Structures are given as structure tokens and as C-alpha cells.
Amino acid sequence: MQQNLKVLMLNGSPRANGNTSVALKEMEQVFKDNGIETEIILVGNKDIRGCIACGSCYEKGKCVFNDMVNELALKFEEADGLVVASPVYYASANATLIACLDRLFYSSHFDKTMKVGASVVCARRGGCSATFDELNKYFTISGMPVASSQYWNSIHGRMPGESEQDGEGKQTMRTLARNMTFLMKS
């Protein structure tokens, strides 16, 4: 019998119910329909320092900055999959999310191999591919299979709620969640 699968979903937007959230909620419903436990954590509006490469995490087993990154590391270790979602700012992810991911991946020393990763980006129009690539690098350097969809994992909208109208983007998120489910169950 297979254990209950868990997916940790990080929302890199500073807006809890913004356009990036629309993408995550589309995925979350597919996961729930497949009996997969989810947790969405808002990261983009938190005060998270960047990594200072002090190396203390090698001695202490966690980041020297005792904030939500250490809590996320515990949740990430227990999860079978990780979804990282970000709005696009100047063809890049939210800087707070990047600071979080740098520290999360560097300071957590558990084996990430074969945990399934997926990145999701939300933009008005441009910069998605660069941001998508930026986020996927955390997975690929960690030996994590990267889930894909039938198109780039992006949803489009600028003003609050606009991404609700992106039918293709929402379908891309549902397909992404189904593909991620398949990989986690494999």
C-alpha cells in the first residue's frame, strides 16, 4: 500500500489571493482529487534574508537565521513534491522567493533526489521563460525530476483576478498537477 503523498506549494507572490494563487489553486484541486495532501505557504510577503554563505548550516544542520526557512525545510523533507510559484518581475522571480529558495536548498541537507519539482510563473505577458528556467535550476541541481505540462508552466494576468480568465493557463496548471501526480506515484 502506498503512503499518503504530500505536496508543498510555495507562493512567491506578495499577494495571498493574487494571480499566482489562481495557478496554485488549480493545481491544488487536482492533487486533492487524487488523494494528495497539499499545503500552500505564502512566502512572497515575508521578510526573508538572503544566504550569506557563512556555512553554519553544515555545523548546525539548519540555517543560522532562525525564520520560516527552517520551518519550510522540515516540511520540504516530509513532502514528496514541491511546487514553487512566482510572479514575474523584470524577467525574474520575486526576490524574496529567491532568497528563500537559496537558503532552503543550501541549508537543508536531506536527500532531495526523486522528490518531484514543478515551477509555475505568472506574468502579464513577457519574462515567463527566463523565470521558469531560473526556478527549475533549484530542482535540477538537486536531482529532482521536473514535472512539465503541455505548455510552459505559466498563467497570465496583470490586474487582480485577470488570470482567472486565462483558460489555457489554468488548463496547463491542471495538466501539470496530473503529470506531477503520475511522477510521484511512479
Role assignments for model-derived ranges:
Residues 36-46:
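A short beta-strand-loop structural module common to alpha/beta enzyme folds
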Residues 23-31, 135:
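Hydrophobic residues within alpha-helices
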Residues 46-76:
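Cysteine-cluster motifs in flexible loop/terminal segments that predominantly coordinate metals
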Residues 5, 64-145, 150-151:
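Helix-loop-strand module that forms the ligand-binding subsite of alpha/beta enzymes
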Residues 4-8, 28, 34, 71, ...:
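Glycine-rich phosphate/pyrophosphate-binding loop and the adjoining helix
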Residues 14-15, 45, 124:
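Short, glycine/serine-rich, charged loops/turns that create anion-binding
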Residues 14-23:
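Glycine- and acidic-residue-enriched helix-capping/strand-helix junction motifs
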